Amino acid sequence: MSQSVESRTRIKSERYESGVIPYAKMGYWDADYVIKETDILALFRITPQPGVDPIEASAAIAGESSTATWTVVWTDLLTACDLYRAKAYRVDPVPNVADQYFAYIAYDIDLFEEGSIANLTASIIGNVFGFKAVKALRLEDMRMPVAYLKTFQGPATGLIVERERMDKFGRPFLGATVKPKLGLSGKNYGRVVYEGLKGGLDFLKDDENINSQPFMRWRERFLYSMEGVNKASASAGEIKGHYLNVTAATMEDMYERAEFSKEVGSIICMIDLVIGYTAIQSMAIWARKHDMILHLHRAGNSTYSRQKNHGMNFRVICKWMRMAGVDHIHAGTVVGKLEGDPLMIKGFYNTLLESETDINLPQGLFFAQNWASLRKVVPVASGGIHAGQMHQLLDYLGDDVVLQFGGGTIGHPDGIQAGATANKVALESMVMARNEGRNYVAKGPQILRDAAKTCGPLQTALDLWKDISFNYTSTDTADFVETPTANI
């Protein structure tokens, strides 16, 4: 219902009084706000300072992440200020947690430059995270409108094209990370790549911190790695790859390394999250132009995603990276050595793989999201996984994933090739059991033991790592109220 002229006049008079007035009074709180299809929505977990009303704190977050400053400024009247103000429209207490609240905030699409993650983040996670009115602030989820998503390229290659290029269907991809991360010579590095691929893996990869150090310069690594790839591919008659990490100090250096990776025949290159959003988008544009798969290692994400009351949830990174245009991103294993609640991990994977997701509070998805035909990102599971967990990995993560066994390949007592073979046989036996309709989750250990009767490397792996697990309580789980209609 439209406001009367008198009401609008009164609000305008109050809203533009000189001096400092509450953010809620300035128009950054609107409990009756009607969400537009083109609005960008954000959900923040706020911990107000003692004595600060949660509605005022939410309005302050809306204001400081959009158009407000600490005092009323008359130049607001030169803009469409009532449109451009972000609106906090709902505040809910966080279930079972004292003094924390979920604040829902809507932003008009015109506040953001088209196709720019850097501009989006400058507002959403900018100065507002240092705001004194809140003790802690965490960005939990976002909804991107279709009109905004259409301004982004999306994944350079995408899952479907990658499967066609690799000629691998009906199962997860298998990979491994070269270990040790640092210190190998180029020749020894290439040998590790060859042995892993010869044993049956689809991919080997560089780790996040191998760039161009004195013990092995990047060009040497690229040449020896691709020698291993080509030799293993010719031997197996299959397409294989190695993620060549092109991360460097400048964009010029990264472009040079990426161009060289293309010249020596690589089908995939790799970057780290720490290079920044603009660099990631730039490399994604380069990758699509040059028909390359682009792998992203999430190095650095836990510095702001792991703590539950401050920073941002990794699902937001998943959304931004799908928009930015990467083809792979590390997204958790559930059973490995790194942080990962099963339901939350499922939410990450759905965010990367589904064309449309619904609200699912147990998975931490607070908004429905239509992905506007952006291609799918392949999640990567790595960190502390081994062949003995194959039934759990297939159950939790499904087919559309890269299973990366680093130590679980290179740590095999009989050598790298044997470690790769153990993982390949474990995966094939589990996929076969699933396709035959067997209860592969309940009977997984027995299926693996049966397969090991004709595969010595698998038997050795099961004997070595059978008791290895990482059963720690996750620090980041979904907060929701259990009800008979909960979306579980």
Swiss-Prot record:
Post-translational modification N6-carboxylysine, affected residues: 205
GO CC term (a single one): chloroplast
Subcellular compartments: Plastid, Chloroplast
Pfam families to which the protein is assigned, alphabetical: RuBisCO_large, RuBisCO_large_N
Top enzyme category: lyase
UniProt catalytic activity: 2 (2R)-3-phosphoglycerate + 2 H(+) = D-ribulose 1,5-bisphosphate + CO2 + H2O; D-ribulose 1,5-bisphosphate + O2 = 2-phosphoglycolate + (2R)-3-phosphoglycerate + 2 H(+)
Entry's Gene Ontology molecular function annotations: magnesium ion binding; monooxygenase activity; ribulose-bisphosphate carboxylase activity
Site (Transition state stabilizer): 337
SUPFAM superfamilies recorded: RuBisCo, C-terminal domain, RuBisCO, large subunit, small (N-terminal) domain
GO biological process: reductive pentose-phosphate cycle
Active site: 179 (proton acceptor), 297 (proton acceptor)
Residues engaged in binding substrate: 127, 177, 181, 298, 330, 382
Domain of life of the native organism: Eukaryota
Cofactor note: Binds 1 Mg(2+) ion per subunit.
Subunit structure and binding partners: Heterohexadecamer of 8 large chains and 8 small chains.
Note: The basic functional RuBisCO is composed of a large chain homodimer in a 'head-to-tail' conformation. In form I RuBisCO this homodimer is arranged in a barrel-like tetramer with the small subunits forming a tetrameric 'cap' on each end of the 'barrel'.
Function, as annotated: RuBisCO catalyzes two reactions: the carboxylation of D-ribulose 1,5-bisphosphate, the primary event in carbon dioxide fixation, as well as the oxidative fragmentation of the pentose substrate in the photorespiration process. Both reactions occur simultaneously and in competition at the same active site.
Protein name as annotated: Ribulose bisphosphate carboxylase large chain
Gene behind this protein: rbcL
